[in-house]
């Protein structure tokens, strides 16, 4: 079975400040099982000054551009932030496992407050979410190790059919739509009959979209 995906957006990270930082692999940062494959949120340490400079709440994104053959490729990862004032200004410490993803243990990167990230979890863990509806909230700490509350805003099933907030239940239905999700009209007033899922998470749902609520 495919992994269950949780897409997390931070509504307060609209135009995040971007700064150049020094990134170092540090033995103090322990690797977390699955962090390199996107199945866990890895840890990063910064000092309080850098955290305030970037207006970071919980998550930081590190991004580099590297040459691969004749192409330039962007590599980025998202991290859960922990404050440690032993870390120098404008420096970020990460695990050696995550440093491997960037191809170096000491490098420069662009850092900014995370806008969106995606985490994959095993389907058996996702059963804890079955029965929740669009608009419901849940604590993410136990599920993905992130100390935030998440609000469900949508999702899709294993065939790609989207959940609709205004359709009760979990069943697949074919209804007349005039707008998203499920249909994007080309003309004003255009309507089309489309297959969608109801607003309740079932075993057939493979992705949910969420926002951080405070």
From Swiss-Prot:
Keyword Transport: no
Biological process annotations from GO: translation
Cited NCBIfam families: PRK04290.1-1
Family: Belongs to the eukaryotic ribosomal protein eS6 family.
Alphabetical list of SMART domains matching this protein: Ribosomal_S6e
GO MF annotation: an example: structural constituent of ribosome
UniProt keyword terms in alphabetical order: Ribonucleoprotein, Ribosomal protein
Database matches in PROSITE patterns: RIBOSOMAL_S6E
Any Pfam family the entry gives: Ribosomal_S6e
A GO CC term assigned to this protein in UniProt: ribosome
Protein name: Small ribosomal subunit protein eS6
């Amino acid at each position: 079975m495919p992994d269950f995906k949780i897409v997390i957006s931070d509504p307060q990270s609209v135009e995040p400040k971007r700064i150049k930082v020094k990134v170092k692999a540090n033995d103090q940062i322990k690797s977390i099982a699955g962090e390199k494959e996107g199945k866990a949120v890895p840890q990063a340490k910064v000092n309080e000054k850098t955290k305030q400079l970037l207006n970071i709440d919980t998550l930081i994104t590190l991004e580099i551009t590297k040459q691969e053959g004749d192409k330039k490729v962007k590599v980025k990862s998202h991290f859960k932030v922990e404050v440690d004032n032993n870390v120098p200004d404008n420096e970020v410490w990460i695990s050696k496992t995550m440093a491997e993803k960037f191809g170096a243990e000491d490098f420069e990167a662009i850092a900014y407050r995370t806008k969106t990230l995606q985490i994959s979890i095993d389907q058996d863990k996702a059963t804890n979410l079955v029965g929740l509806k669009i608009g419901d909230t849940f604590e993410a700490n136990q599920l993905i190790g992130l100390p935030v509350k998440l609000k469900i805003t949508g999702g899709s099933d294993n065939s790609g059919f989207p959940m609709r907030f205004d359709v009760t239940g979990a069943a697949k239905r074919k209804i007349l739509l005039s707008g998203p999700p499920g249909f994007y009209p080309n003309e004003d007033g255009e309507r089309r009959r489309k297959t969608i899922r109801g607003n309740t998470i079932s075993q057939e749902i493979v992705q949910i979209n969420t926002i951080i609520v405070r």
